[in-house]
């Protein structure tokens, strides 16, 4: 559980709205390298925001942590020591956010609330009030702030700029939208926005930690948006127009943030079926808090490799000219029980929950893994392996190869 051992309860953040008193604390590492390597090692442990004592009673849901944010205007105010860096070479020229950008920023916080136990509350900047997380577009030119990449987000701390997110002027006309976004590139403005919000919530780049290593094979944006290494990411082209396939927080981002703040155990807690369009590429991670759930690719014609194991990825075969390995993740501690393949020759792997796995058409390979599973090859010449548990394997059609594996298995013929 996040914050199980407090090392230090810090002072109040220095640039927050006047009635708040939002504070931070430093907690112990989780003991899991792929989580702890995403935290700063310049303190005794990772830093996180405590719930806002002024807003908590009104906005906390089921014990959620309340964190305020604000979107600075072109008349934003600062505490006198806000820009107290190593030198005084800062030049500030305010640029207001467009209304569409504000809508997209709010939508980003909605995404974060889906998988973390955080309620984000927007406060208006007026009369010296500002949120603990604060957004700007401006022309800060000091090299001490490190804006060479176009944006910066400060970690939770007690100094005035802690939690603040600053974009360079070139973002003034950018779209922070999600989905397929025209001209967004392979690392979209929304990915930059997500990256910086995650800094403001307390996580760092993989590879920054001096003693704990992030898995080297996972240092790509499809595993964590905290890296700038894109791997096999590519734009999607349709009718002569190039679109960015926009991604949000991925498997390892979610793991680190859930350690800090806990998980939203209400999100998708019922019985959910995840449908996708074969002509619409995506990169995403599923957080599902409960119920009996299904990944359904029955409307796809190309082969997919589908894994229901938490923390692992699936490679989805789209019916358009776009491909990327490992584009769909399932968060650690999320359980998806069932999966349906499409018309291609799919490879489907279950988990210990007791799965219903359907290959549909094509020559499929299905592995139930542990648990009491139901395996359906359906059409095609399939390979069906029950593995552990007491499985029921259906030889539905075609020349199937069946291996029961461990347990008391049953084979049923069509």
Model features per residue range: what roles?
Residues 281-344, 349, 353:
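Beta-propeller domains
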Residues 25-64, 100-237, 241, 290-294, ...:
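Metzincin-family zinc-dependent endopeptidase catalytic domain
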Residues 1-97, 148:
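Disordered inhibitory propeptide/activation segment of secreted metzincin zinc metalloprotease zymogens
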Residues 163, 169, 184, 277-278, ...:
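Low-complexity, polar/charged sequence tracts that form flexible coils or short amphipathic helices
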Residues 290, 299-301, 310, 340-345, ...:
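Extracellular, beta-strand-rich repeat scaffolds characterized by small/acidic residue-biased motifs
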Residues 74-79, 89-92, 171-175, 232-233, ...:
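A short, flexible beta-alpha/helix-coil linker loop
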């Amino acid at each position: 559980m996040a914050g199980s051992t407090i090392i230090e309860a810090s002072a109040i953040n220095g640039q927050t709205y006047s009635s708040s008193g939002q504070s931070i604390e430093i907690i112990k590492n989780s003991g899991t390298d792929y989580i702890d390597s995403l935290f700063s090692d310049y303190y005794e442990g990772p830093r996180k925001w405590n719930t806002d004592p002024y807003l908590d009673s009104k906005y906390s849901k089921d014990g959620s942590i309340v964190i305020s944010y604000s979107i600075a205007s072109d008349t934003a105010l600062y505490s006198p020591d806000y820009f107290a860096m190593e030198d005084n070479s800062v030049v500030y020229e305010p640029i207001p956010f467009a209304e569409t950008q504000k809508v997209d920023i709010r939508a980003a916080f909605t995404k974060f609330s889906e998988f973390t136990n955080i309620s984000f509350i927007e406060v208006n900047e007026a009369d010296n009030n500002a949120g603990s997380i604060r957004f700007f577009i401006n022309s800060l030119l000091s090299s001490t702030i490190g804006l060479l990449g176009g944006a910066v987000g400060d970690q939770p701390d007690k100094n005035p700029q802690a939690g603040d997110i600053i974009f360079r002027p070139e973002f003034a006309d950018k779209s922070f939208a999600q989905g397929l976004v025209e001209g967004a590139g392979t690392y979209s403005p929304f990915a930059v926005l997500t990256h910086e919000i995650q800094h403001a919530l307390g996580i760092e780049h993989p590879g920054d930690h001096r003693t704990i290593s992030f898995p080297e094979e996972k240092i790509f944006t499809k595993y964590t948006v905290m890296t700038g290494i894109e791997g096999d990411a590519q734009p999607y082209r349709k009718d002569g127009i190039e679109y960015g396939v926009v991604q949000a927080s991925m498997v390892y981002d979610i793991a680190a943030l859930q350690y800090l703040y806990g998980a939203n155990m209400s999100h998708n807690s019922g019985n959910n079926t995840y449908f996708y369009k074969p002509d619409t590429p995506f990169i995403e991670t599923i957080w599902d808090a409960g119920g009996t759930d299904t990944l359904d690719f029955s409307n796809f014609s190309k082969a997919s490799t589908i894994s229901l194991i938490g923390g692992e990825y699936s490679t989805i075969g789209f019916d358009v000219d776009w491909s990327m390995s490992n584009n769909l993740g399932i968060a650690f501690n999320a359980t998806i029980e069932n999966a349906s393949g499409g018309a291609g020759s799919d490879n489907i792997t279950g988990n210990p929950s007791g799965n219903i796995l359907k290959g549909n058409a094509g020559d499929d390979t299905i592995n139930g893994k542990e648990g009491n599973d139901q395996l359906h090859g359906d059409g095609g010449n399939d390979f069906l392996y029950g593995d552990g548990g007491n499985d029921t394997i259906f030889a539905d059609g075609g020349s199937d190869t069946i291996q029961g594996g461990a347990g008391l298995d049953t084979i049923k013929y069509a």
